[in-house]
Amino acid sequence: MTNIRKSHPLIKIINESFIDLPAPSNISAWWNFGSLLGVCLILQILTGLFLAMHYTSDTATAFSSVTHICRDVNYGWIIRYMHANGASMFFICLFMHIGRGMYYGSYTFSETWNIGILLLFTVMATAFMGYVLPWGQMSFWGATVITNLLSAIPYIGTNLVEWIWGGFSVDKATLTRFFAFHFILPFIIAALAAVHLLFLHETGSNNPSGLTSNSDKIPFHPYYTIKDILGLLLLIMALMLLVLFSPDLLGDPDNYTPANPLNTPPHIKPEWYFLFAYAILRSIPNKLGGVVALVLSILILAVMPLLHTSKQRSMMFRPLSQCLFWLLVADLLTLTWIGGQPVEHPFITIGQLASILYFFTILVLMPISSMIENRFLKW
């Protein structure tokens, strides 16, 4: 009799994905973030489900319902803060996961990479709409500013914005539809993640050396299940430290003031994980130009496989490319800092220089450095 894990139609899929999956023997802790993202998604769906049971998507009661969750619902405060800070953890894992893909050349699996970019856009849209739901000052004005960017699209812009708003300003209709989308999108993300995994398992995982590992594979269970559990424990520990000791560390104080269309906050800014893109948007004086740069700052990931000029896949043995990679990381941290600063001298200039450097590094410096390294190795 064959093992049920290998014969049952459903269990067989799980077995081939998480138990008997052949994995390279040398993948490092940087390969933990995929499973951590799965855990983050499950955590967000569960906490979000319990929040949705008590939340009301009406402009008159949305803010009060969030207050009610924190004050009157049993353990409502911890569910709310786990959901809010869970989003930050989600993005930390996402950025690490993408950085790993860039460093070790995982983008050469083009289908997996492109689904990943689609996932990134979907997660960003979900997080943005979630930020609007508490209906605080920053929720309202963030929604107004970001949706207004679509008015920069020639000819159809204004109609498009009013169609998204469901009226002539961000109001009850906007909040209701944002809640509906915020509820459904995580399930679409889960489906896309399954497709992401499907494409990954067609080729097998990459590894730090960037070389083929077909000659040296080990089963996923128990080796990588135990490794993933360690990563999970560290993630939960970091999240709970944040939630229990400083839950508002990454939030904005303005969001504790109910939304008021007649009073604009002095500095409108999104959550920290969007600040790098927000800084790129603000660094261009023209509205349409800013929106294009904003979209391209993420979409640029799609051209990475085309810009790969090196004869080696990974950056493990390419010191010049490594330096440029860490320059890019430093540049993104600079952009994140600038995005949270007011629009005044010297922040405007720093933001513009950092934005130029971001695109220049990916589009020009990295391909050139790869070609120089090829010459060094006489390839």
From Swiss-Prot:
It is a multi-pass membrane protein. It is found in: Mitochondrion inner membrane. It comes from the Eukaryota. A ubiquinone binds at residue 201. One of its GO terms (cellular component) is respiratory chain complex III. Its main location: mitochondrion. PANTHER family: CYTOCHROME B. Heme 1 (or BL or b562) is low-potential and absorbs at about 562 nm, and heme 2 (or BH or b566) is high-potential and absorbs at about 566 nm. Component of the ubiquinol-cytochrome c reductase complex (complex III or cytochrome b-c1 complex) that is part of the mitochondrial respiratory chain. The b-c1 complex mediates electron transfer from ubiquinol to cytochrome c. Contributes to the generation of a proton gradient across the mitochondrial membrane that is then used for ATP synthesis. The cytochrome bc1 complex contains 11 subunits: 3 respiratory subunits (MT-CYB, CYC1 and UQCRFS1), 2 core proteins (UQCRC1 and UQCRC2) and 6 low-molecular weight proteins (UQCRH/QCR6, UQCRB/QCR7, UQCRQ/QCR8, UQCR10/QCR9, UQCR11/QCR10 and a cleavage product of UQCRFS1). This cytochrome bc1 complex then forms a dimer. This is Cytochrome b. It comes from Salanoia concolor.
